[in-house]
Structure formats: structure tokens, C-alpha cells
Amino acid sequence: MNPSEMQRKAPPRRRRHRNRAPLTHKMNKMVTSEEQMKLPSTKKAEPPTWAQLKKLTQLATKYLENTKVTQTPESMLLAALMIVSMVVSLPMPAGAAAANYTYWAYVPFPPLIRAVTWMDNPIEVYVNDSVWVPGPIDDRCPAKPEEEGMMINISIGYRYPPICLGTAPGCLMPAVQNWLVEVPIVSPISRFTYHMVSGMSLRPRVNYLQDFSYQRSLKFRPKGKPCPKEIPKESKNTEVLVWEECVANSAVILQNNEFGTIIDWAPRGQFYHNCSGQTQSCPSAQVSPAVDSDLTESLDKHKHKKLQSFYPWEWGEKGISTPRPKIVSPVSGPEHPELWRLTVASHHIRIWSGNQTLETRDRKPFYTVDLNSSLTVPLQSCVKPPYMLVVGNIVIKPDSQTITCENCRLLTCIDSTFNWQHRILLVRAREGVWIPVSMDRPWEASPSIHILTEVLKGVLNRSKRFIFTLIAVIMGLIAVTATGAVAGVALHSSVQSVNFVNDWQKNSTRLWNSQSSIDQKLANQINDLRQTVIWMGDRLMSLEHRFQLQCDWNTSDFCITPQIYNESEHHWDMVRRHLQGREDNLTLDISKLKEQIFKASKAHLNLVPGTEAIAGVADGLANLNPVTWVKTIGSTTIINLILILVCLFCLLLVCRCTQQL
């Protein structure tokens, strides 16, 4: 065979060698047992939460205090490991995995909002220019411009009529209002010289309180200084307007329908004919609609106004006062002067200067009011957390007591760019809600006594097992503590698993806290202090609830109470309506529920003596020390005699063995 033929035959042998490798690889992988599969109950452990670690530290500290052991890092670690091992070593009874325990929980500051109603106290509305608009000033708003205008869909309930502004049923409608002051005469032919301010305000539905007699209307008349009978006198400076609250002689109705009756006792200044002393036929002394529409037709188009008549022009309802609407039916609530500050900021205000002159035409007196405007002032009004403004196509349904709005925007400020085709709904963050939550274990104020007792028995009987358990706990501390997370609910269906409430409330807490942050450089301003007091009041109320409640040991962001949820007494539809903010006869009786929960919390204060339980564990663990065993054995006389006899017997045996050798 020549070399060329050998080269042609060599490759097949190499191919057989290469084909042998995959077979060897497969043989190495071949097993005789079935492939092991993870059981459905096997779950990946999550890292421990801060609440769990904090609670574990508190329990360890309490244990060291009760046992009078010095708190060192080593002792704290051992105490924490001991507590974790006690809880983990509890044998789970059959069917316990499927057990479901449902309790009432109080969740402070959830990610929910409610409507501000006419029965709520007035809120703080801040303006950027206090020269022309009275009220607290703050030109730093909005605090977070990047969050202005976030889209939201809402469906919330209400008990009392909500506060709404705009052209929709249940909302106060906007209109232009004028305020007039008289300045010193600057011309011999001028009877009066005026400064007038025009701005957006609240539209009266009825000029006077016609639905009640004058005597009955006095029942709703607020206390305050009556409005002046003469036009207020001001200086020549058109850049200053002094506001002074006063009460008019009669009220106007802003709303009178199924949503309630809302009135306002602020003056509504208008030009009208003064017919006193006139012998000829004089137009009605009531405000002329034509004149009124001519004065207030538009704040943009008309920069010159002229009123002419053979009769003197008179300004009715003197006074420079802002509207202060209040509800009088079906309930009587407080005044809300802050609403006007939101309305007036929706469009710039216009400043007028002019006079009233007297001439003679056809041998008759002829009166002319001439007003000119060359100055407009843009405004901005803002609210601060926990309050917000929902802007959009808001629909209020009185039959179901619900408010809906799709594709609405969340704002904190209103300025002259606002479009009155939308409506404004005042909302605020919910202070807290009561909801049922489910747990996979019974409620406990601390690691329960029976768990510690049962585990302690096993540990004392098998001390080696305790050592191995301790090592296992050290190796898997993160996985162990992660199993203690609590459960939560789904808002729109029923009671569900627990992690939902924790994440739900944690995210909302971060949201409200970020919105309520205060600029420390300007913390000395009174407005910041005022808003901080309002916000802290809600926090103190939440803390008051927490102090009165006995909470489950494994939760800190919200409180799971020992009160068991009874579905037959409070069905889920009642809970759902409570979450929506509806407080009718079908919703939860919160006051009664609180009373029951506070009683249950008080009863559990003495049912879980953690001090005795931890002390018992400490005594049991002390018995594991071999030194104590020797000390105890050596302290008895009988045992000592037996030991001496045993030693003598052994010595005797040793002596005999040595003699035989």
C-alpha cells in the first residue's frame, strides 16, 4: 500500500473516534432515578422587609432586658436568632397551609382621595399677588411642576354635597364681578372719579333670597360688619386695592337644586339708575341686564366702557368684599371664602379708571360714566397637600352619591390659562381607611406563647437539634424573615393575599410625603407653618389611632387589629363603598366599628404576657448549660455519696487487677 492510499483510508478511523465522544458524554449524564421536580409549595424567598427587621430587633431587645443581659452586638444577634428559631421550628399542622384568618386593619394615608364637601372647614388657597387678591401669598407654587397635569380616572363617593366649580350640575358657575371705589375729583365737570376692578367670580342664580322671607333669611346671616352705604374712598394710586369684608343687606343664591342651596352675603356691586326725586318715568331701580352685560361682557375685548342716561348712575351694594358662599340646605355648613381665590385666578383681572360727568342735553341733565382700562394683572392660585384639584369633565350623580371623571388631570395651581369648559373638583388625601385583610396565621401581638412553649420542649429534649437549628437559621436568616410578610386586599373585588396592602400603602406614603415636603430655607414663613399644622393634624390623628390599637407584631406600616372580620355583619359591598368614600346608610358604621376594635385591642393587652413567655424561654435555655447540670448534681448529698461509693468500687477493682498481675 502506497502512502497516498493510507491517507485516503485514515479519515474514517478518525471519524469513528469523534463519534465515540458524544456517546461517552451521554453515558456520563445517564441516571437511573427520575428527575427531581420542585413541589408546588416550594417558593423563592424574598429579602426581609425593614418592618420585619425592626420588629425582630425590638423583640430581641425586650428579651435581653427581661433576662438582664447586657446588650452587646453578640447578645443581640443570639437573641434574634433564638426568636427566629422559635417561630420557624413550630410544626405546621395538617391543613394549616390552607387556613385563612381575616381581621380588620387600619391603613393610614392610603393612595385614595375624597372630595372636599361643603361641610368641611375652609382650606388654604395661596395667591401669588396679595395686592389685588386678599389671602395668604406664596409665589413658589407649584412645588413640583413636573407632576402638574398627571392624568387620572376617579370614581369616588360622598356624603355631603362636594365643592365643585364650573358649568355643570352641582357646580358653582363662574361669572364676571366688579368692585368699585371712589377717588378724589380731578375735574370740575366730574361728579365722581372711579377705580374699578373686574374679575371672574361666582354667578348668582337668583338676585335676592326669594325662597325665604326676610326674617327667615336673618337666620343664615353671618356675623360681621355691615357693608358701607357710600362708595369706599381710595387714593389716586391705582396699584392698591384695600379689601374689607362686610355683610350685604341681602343674600344671593348661587345654587338651589337637588344638590343643595348655597347662598352668599357678599355685596354684588352694579351700576343702576337712581330714581329718587325723579318726576319723570324712571327705569326700574333693579340692575339693568343690558347695562350689566355691557359692563361685564368680556375681560379681553372691551377696554372702554361708556354708560349714558338722563338719570343719575348709582352703584348698588357698596363695599370691597370677596364672596363667601355657604350651604344652608339640606345642611348648614361653614363659609368658604377660598373658592373665590380659585375662580378669580382662572382669568386675569382688569383695572379700570374713569369718572361720571354731568352734561345738559335738550335742557335736561345727562349723565355719562366713562371707564377705560389699560392694565391687566395675571394671577395664580394654588393649594398644597393634602389638597389637590381634579380638572376635567366631572359628573356628580346625586342618586348614587358618586363622582366620576375620566381622563382628568391632577393639579395644584390654577392660572389665567384655565379653560372653563372644564370643571374643578377639590379633593384631599384620605386620612385612613378600615379594611379586612387576610393572614395565613392567627393574629398575634408578639410570637405566641404556645409556639415558644412547644419549641422549647423540643429544644430541651434534643439539645443537639437546637444547635443544628441555630446553624440553619444563621445560614438562612434572610429567607426565614421574608416568610413573615402580611397580606392585603384588592380594592374592587374582595379580601385577598397580604403583600398588596403593604406595597399599596408604602407607595402612597412615599407619594404624600414627597408632596408635603417643605422648603427648609423658607420654613419661617407663616403660610408654610399653617399648612404644616394642617398636615401634622392628620398625622397626629393617625398616631392617636395607632396608640389606641393593639396591632399584629409583624406589621408596622399599617395596623392589623385583633377584631375578626365577620362577612355576615359587614359584607364586601359595604367595605367597597367605604373605600369609595360613600357614607350613606349602607356603608360601614365607622364609629361603631372603631368602638368594637378598641375594645378588642384593650382585651388583648393582658392576653399576651410576652415578659413571662420570654422569661420562660430564657430559663429553658439556661438549662442547656452543662455547668449548671454539674452544679445541680453536686449540690445533693445522696448523689455525692453514690459517687463516692462508685469511685471506691472502681478503685477496688483496679487494686485486684494489679495483684493478679
UniProtKB/Swiss-Prot annotation:
Specific enzymatic cleavages in vivo yield the mature SU and TM proteins. Residues 466-486 are annotated as: Fusion peptide. Glycans are attached at N100, N128, N153, N274, N355, N372, N461, N507, N554, N566, N585. Residues 1-89 form the signal peptide. The chain crosses the membrane at residues 633-653. Residues 10-20 have a biased composition (Basic residues). Keywords: Cell membrane, Cleavage on pair of basic residues, Disulfide bond, ERV, Glycoprotein, Membrane, Signal, Transmembrane, Transmembrane helix, Transposable element, Viral envelope protein, Virion. One of its GO terms (molecular function) is structural molecule activity. Pfam families: GP41, HERV-K_env_2, HERV-K_REC. InterPro entries: GP41-like, HERV-K_env, Retroviral_env_glycoprotein. It is found in: Virion. Its main location: virion. One of its GO terms (cellular component) is plasma membrane. The record marks R465, F466 as: Cleavage. Residues 1-47 are annotated as: Disordered. The keyword Thylakoid does not apply. Has a type 2 genome. The HERV-K(HML-2) family contains type 1 and type 2 genomes depending on the absence or presence of 292 nucleotides at the 5'-end of the env gene resulting in Env proteins of distinct sizes. Despite their overall retroviral envelope structure HERV-K(HML-2) type 1 envelope proteins lack a predictable signal sequence. Subgenomic RNA transcripts coding for full-length envelope proteins have been detected for both type of genomes. The surface (SU) and transmembrane (TM) proteins form a heterodimer. SU and TM are attached by noncovalent interactions or by a labile interchain disulfide bond. Retroviral envelope proteins mediate receptor recognition and membrane fusion during early infection. Endogenous envelope proteins may have kept, lost or modified their original function during evolution. Belongs to the beta type-B retroviral envelope protein family. HERV class-II K(HML-2) env subfamily. This is Endogenous retrovirus group K member 25 Env polyprotein. The lineage of its organism: Eukaryota, Metazoa, Chordata, Craniata, Vertebrata. The gene is ERVK-25.
